[in-house]
Swiss-Prot record:
It comes from Xylella fastidiosa (strain Temecula1 / ATCC 700964). This is Ribosome maturation factor RimM. NCBIfam families: 16S_RimM. GO terms for molecular function: ribosome binding. GO terms for cellular component: cytoplasm; ribosome. Residues 98-170 form the PRC barrel domain. The gene is rimM.
Length: 170
């Protein structure tokens, strides 16, 4: 991974599973086990130490995502990396389908109404089960459903702008 390449946080190590070095992973990919498709990983420990890892394997079991990392064979090895964040370069992710977006690509874009009123910039997104929601930080925080074409009219990465059909007083 090049030093200046944008890094995307995909997950983190949350603990051990059993005694043989299996690792519980929290993954923010969709589906959760897609995290294993995007390797090598840049691992960043809670102290800021970084290392590259290739060859992680894993599987889902109930609500858990369980992984094995090369070189970690016991619970002590897992405890040493607990809290480690898992990053990949943005270039490791496949291009999204038309009219689909990676949330991370929307973060930081300015949000304008159809009338040109600037509401703020995208802080982050979350899913409420029915749809995705844009969290906008401006003079106040706003939550706008990311529903095209009802509320989100356009996304323009070159202009770094999202245009929404939204009452600025709401």
């Amino acid at each position: 991974m090049k030093d200046n390449e944008r890094r995307i946080l995909l997950g983190r190590v949350v603990g051990g599973f059993g005694l043989r070095g299996e690792i519980k992973i929290e993954s923010w990919t969709e589906p959760r086990d897609a995290i294993f498709r995007y390797q090598p990983w840049l691992l960043r420990s809670p102290t800021g130490t970084e290392s590259m890892l290739n060859g992680a394997r894993g599987y889902e079991t109930g609500k858990r995502l369980i992984a094995t990392f090369p070189g970690i064979n016991d619970r002590n090895g897992v405890e040493a990396i607990c809290g480690t964040e898992i990053y990949v370069p943005r270039s490791a992710l496949p291009p999204p389908h038309p009219d689909e977006y990676y949330w991370v690509d929307l973060e930081g874009l300015q949000v304008h109404t159809l009338e040109g009123v600037v509401l703020g910039s995208v802080s982050h997104l979350f899913s409420n089960g029915a749809n995705d929601v844009i969290v906008i930080h401006g003079e106040r925080e706003r939550l706008i459903p990311f529903v095209q074409p009802d509320y989100v009219k356009s996304v323009d990465f070159e202009a770094e702008r999202i245009v929404v059909d939204w009452d600025p007083e709401f």
